[in-house]
């Protein structure tokens, strides 16, 4: 196993141009493929999850030209649903990319063809039952190949009817995102009713915005009910700029708050569509100095104190708060993050385990975590659980006058392949 030993970082200072958002990149690629016309995507994220989507689209008959640096992609839209009936059974390997598995599962039900959706072992532990149930309500033919409610899946594309659909919103917002993006191409109008509390609402806002950018508007009734007209076609916007990844910004902003100097991240700002920019508000509540621009956020050092906050709206960036808590006085309480348990790994268990290794006192609950900083951080080998965010979060331990060893550092390739080089570039 590869390891990366990070030496203590005394101070951070400088500017980071963020890679494109994973959530936006894969949504934009799929809608560009289904749209009428050609879309040029710029600032596309170059990472494993995006590669899995691109590979799948190629197999599905979508033509695109990817630039040498893989950050620009010209997609020739089909102007219709996928139709691979003449190709026989197609197997699509999607790694551990939830942002590819869930939306493709819904989109493939719209057209003609037979598909197997598969991936890495962890993907088979990530639930998809709520989405499949909703698709079956709309007439889709989706079956489980191994365990009920989990991939791998077999899909027989026969079109989606639409109609009145109930979908569980309490586990992952990606189920609703997937259904929303497919619904305009259903045969009839669709009315979606959310059952339970809808988690990660900001990610649904991203979905509604990008659908709008591709010419489709959704009638949103307070995130409890959504009405979508059927028999529509997405329209290529011509050019689509992918915002910087707000979740990826969190590590650098936290570093600025802990050991600035001043860190400026560009590619996101107060006009961003991503909910994870609210991470900066949480940092500010802890005592960091934050400055907002239209397309940048700056963070500088402050005396950090613990916070007690419901972070259901920023689940990915909330992980960074858990590590920032190592530098705060008092006990930080992060609440309402059950969906950490169904991400790339069980993040509540993983976070609690690794925080204890560096000396923190941790309480792990069903849907919350409490973190109290030690008097002194200790050098530990951090297991990353094949989870990109674990590796990036725990790099911040090096800001505490201690070495930290990151196991399997290349797992950051899921969203941020050159993360450690970028961190080194602002380390003094």
UniProtKB/Swiss-Prot annotation:
Report the locations given in the UniProt record: Cytoplasm
What pathway does the UniProt record associate with this protein?
Answer: Metabolic intermediate biosynthesis; chorismate biosynthesis; chorismate from D-erythrose 4-phosphate and phosphoenolpyruvate: step 6/7
**Which residues does UniProt mark as catalytic?**
316
Which is one GO molecular function term here?
3-phosphoshikimate 1-carboxyvinyltransferase activity
Looking at the UniProt record for this protein, which Gene Ontology cellular component terms does it annotate, in alphabetical order? cytoplasm
Which residues span the membrane?
Answer: none
Query: Pfam families, from UniProt?
Result: EPSP_synthase
- The residues that hold phosphoenolpyruvate are 22, 98, 126, 174, 347, 389, 414
**KW Cytoplasm (keyword) present:** yes
- Could you describe the subunit structure of this protein? Monomer.
Protein task: Catalyzes the transfer of the enolpyruvyl moiety of phosphoenolpyruvate (PEP) to the 5-hydroxyl of shikimate-3-phosphate (S3P) to produce enolpyruvyl shikimate-3-phosphate and inorganic phosphate.
Q: What is this protein called?
A: 3-phosphoshikimate 1-carboxyvinyltransferase
């Amino acid at each position: 196993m590869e390891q990366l030993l990070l030496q203590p970082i005394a101070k951070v200072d400088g500017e980071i141009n963020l890679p494109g958002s994973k959530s936006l990149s894969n949504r934009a690629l799929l809608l560009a493929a289904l749209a009428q016309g050609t879309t040029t995507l710029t600032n596309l994220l170059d990472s494993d999850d995006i590669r899995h989507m691109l590979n799948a689209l190629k197999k599905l008959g979508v033509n695109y030209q990817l630039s040498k640096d893989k950050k620009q992609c010209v997609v020739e839209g089909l102007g219709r649903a996928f139709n691979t009936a003449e190709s026989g059974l197609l197997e699509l390997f999607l790694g551990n990319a939830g942002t590819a598995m869930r939306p493709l599962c819904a989109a493939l039900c719209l057209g003609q063809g037979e598909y197997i959706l598969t991936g890495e072992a962890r993907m088979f532990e990530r639930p998809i039952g709520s989405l499949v149930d909703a698709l079956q309500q709309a007439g889709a033919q989706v079956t489980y190949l191994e365990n009920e409610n989990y991939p791998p899946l077999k899909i027989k594309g026969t079109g989606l009817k639409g109609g009145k659909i109930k979908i569980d919103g309490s586990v992952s917002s990606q189920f609703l995102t997937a259904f929303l993006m497919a619904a305009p191409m259903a045969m009839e109008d669709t009315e979606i009713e959310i059952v339970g509390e809808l988690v990660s609402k900001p990610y649904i806002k991203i979905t509604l915005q990008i659908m709008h950018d591709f010419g489709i508007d959704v009638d949103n009734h307070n995130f409890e009910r959504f009405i979508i007209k059927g028999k529509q076609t997405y329209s290529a916007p011509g050019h689509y700029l992918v915002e910087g990844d707000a979740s990826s910004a969190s590590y650098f902003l936290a570093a600025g708050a802990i050991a600035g100097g001043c860190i400026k991240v560009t590619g996101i700002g107060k006009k961003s569509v991503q909910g994870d920019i609210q991470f900066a508000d949480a940092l500010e509540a802890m005592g960091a100095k934050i400055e907002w621009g239209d397309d940048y956020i700056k963070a500088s050092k402050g005396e950090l104190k613990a916070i007690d906050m419901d972070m259901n709206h920023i689940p990915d960036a909330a992980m960074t708060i858990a590590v920032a808590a190592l530098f705060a006085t008092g006990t930080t309480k992060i609440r309402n993050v059950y969906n950490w348990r169904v991400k790339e790994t069980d993040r509540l268990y993983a976070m609690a385990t690794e925080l204890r290794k560096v000396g923190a006192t941790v309480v792990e609950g069903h849907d919350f975590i409490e973190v109290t900083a030690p008097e002194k951080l200790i050098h530990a080998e951090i297991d990353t659980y094949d989870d990109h965010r674990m590796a990036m979060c725990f790099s911040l331990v090096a800001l505490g006058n201690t070495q930290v060893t990151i196991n399997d550092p290349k797992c950051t390739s899921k969203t941020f392949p050159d993360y450690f080089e970028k961190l080194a570039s602002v380390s003094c």
